[in-house]
């Protein structure tokens, strides 16, 4: 539910990250938090102008962003964790519970959970989601039917991209090639898993090359689960980069996870990151699920925590996004499709500081670039009047406590997220 469109005119004053405002606009220098106090003018759901405010006027203004992007999700299994738990929180437990859930997966359940996910994402301030779909087995067809239906239903609100997740070798079979053509014809991407751990055998190399060549022929992108382990450090992303370079393949390619690469020593990590940048390989880091599952020992807290080396990749010129991955399913018990929750988590987990451009871009402009979205998320004259306005006036306030928010889409204010409504569990708790 959303309110009526706002009349043309000025929106309330706000504080924006300078990195999300037109780089060509004549604006005052950002403050020490990277913020600029501005007042936006909108008409017909578009930004008409960006007006500057007097210096020192932003201290009590709300912090605002443009709607953010979720580059890696699994809508087909979201919210299934209560029914198919993984109490030990292990990779083996996740795979076993996922298998039990998949055997009972039906179109109506995927549709219901997917609708729940998109409704929450919409209210929280997400404008696009890329979701992988388990696509080899009897659950594949009903999952695709449900999510294609939801993609159409949510078009214009949350852009939904779909990736076919199968063993990489499946794309070499006649059935796999036919399915790839169907996926590409429906605007999807080809996916697969390298690992975990990935040992890079000759058969693996041949299967991956066949997938990349197939994607190039079909003109579609590839998004792989790569190196999601604490072993064989970076071997999968190294093979991907090498094949793209040697065979001069023009395939939009994303490596999701790249977790074991983070355990490389500085020199090898830097050289691999440079090779990935040269091959135009993008990366989606997934700290929530990776820190929950990888390197886990039942009797001790691990000191080595495999996750993508975001800073080293960025320094080499690799486009890096951060995603939430699994949401309340056997792979991760938390999450809620809340990009601000993910941003707050990543401060401690990945040392990403949002007051710097490269700390914010993985959730905004870099994620939009990896998904190939029409809008990069930067506000300029003519861009969508889409905002995520927070009940915090600084990054410190945002990080201190979960902020309330209001989302503006095409000049209409949305209803607040469901989490901001009083919980019925607390109905009896009053003075």
Enumerate the language-model features and the residues they cover:
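N-terminal metal-binding scaffold of metallo-dependent hydrolase/deaminase domains
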Residues: 1-56, 395
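Di-metal (Zn2+ and/or Mg2+/Mn2+) metal-binding site signature of metallo-dependent hydrolases
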Residues: 61-84, 229-230
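Alpha-helical scaffold segments that flank or form the walls of functional sites
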Residues: 63, 81-132, 138-153, 181-184
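Active-site mouth loops of central-metabolism enzymes
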Residues: 97-112, 163-174, 194-202
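Histidine/acidic residue-rich metal-binding segments in metalloenzymes
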Residues: 142-156, 173-256, 260-282, 299-322, ...
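His/Asp/Glu-enriched, well-ordered alpha-helical/loop segment
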Residues: 242-253, 293, 304-390
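C-terminal cap of metal-dependent C-N hydrolases
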Residues: 362, 379-431
């Amino acid at each position: 539910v959303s309110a009526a469109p706002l009349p043309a005119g000025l929106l309330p004053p706000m504080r924006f990250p300078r990195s999300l405002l037109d780089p060509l606009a004549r604006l005052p220098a950002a403050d020490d938090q990277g913020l600029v106090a501005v007042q936006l003018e909108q008409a017909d759901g578009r930004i008409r102008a960006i007006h500057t405010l007097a210096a020192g006027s932003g201290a009590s203004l709300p912090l605002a962003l443009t709607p953010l992007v979720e580059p890696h999700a699994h809508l087909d299994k979201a919210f299934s964790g209560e029914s198919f738990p993984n109490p030990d929180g292990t990779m083996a437990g996740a795979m076993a519970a996922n298998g039990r859930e998949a055997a009972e997966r039906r179109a109506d359940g995927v549709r219901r959970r997917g609708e729940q996910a998109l409704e929450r994402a919409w209210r929280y301030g997400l404008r696009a989601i890329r979701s992988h779909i388990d696509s080899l087995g009897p659950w594949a067809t009903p999952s695709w039917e449900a999510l294609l239906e939801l993609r159409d239903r949510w078009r214009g609100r949350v852009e939904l991209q779909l990736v076919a997740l199968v063993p990489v070798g499946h794309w070499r079979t006649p059935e796999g090639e036919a399915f790839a053509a169907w996926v590409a014809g429906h605007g999807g991407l080809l996916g697969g898993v390298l690992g975990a751990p990935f040992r890079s055998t000759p058969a693996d190399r041949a299967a991956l090359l066949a997938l990349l060549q197939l994607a190039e022929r079909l003109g579609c992108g590839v998004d792989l689960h790569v190196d999601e382990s604490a072993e064989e450090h970076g071997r999968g992303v190294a093979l991907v980069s090498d094949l793209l370079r040697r065979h001069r393949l023009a395939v939009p390619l994303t490596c999701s996870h790249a977790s074991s690469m983070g355990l490389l020593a500085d020199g090898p990590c830097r050289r691999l990151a440079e090779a990935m940048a040269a091959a135009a390989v993008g990366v989606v880091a997934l700290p929530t699920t990776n820190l929950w599952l990888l390197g886990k020992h039942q009797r001790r807290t691990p000191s080595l925590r495999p996750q993508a080396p975001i800073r080293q990749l960025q320094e080499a010129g690799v486009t890096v996004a951060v995603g939430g991955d699994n949401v309340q399913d056997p792979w991760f018990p938390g999450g809620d499709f809340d990009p601000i929750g993910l941003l707050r988590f990543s401060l401690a987990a990945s040392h990403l500081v949002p007051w710097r451009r490269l700390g914010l871009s993985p959730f905004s402009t870099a994620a939009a670039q990896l998904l190939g979205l029409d809008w990069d998320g930067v506000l300029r004259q003519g861009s969508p009047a889409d905002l995520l306005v927070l009940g915090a006036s600084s990054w410190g306030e945002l990080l201190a406590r979960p902020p309330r928010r209001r989302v503006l889409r095409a000049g209409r204010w949305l209803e607040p997220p469901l989490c901001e409504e009083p919980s019925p569990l607390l109905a009896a708790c009053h003075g």
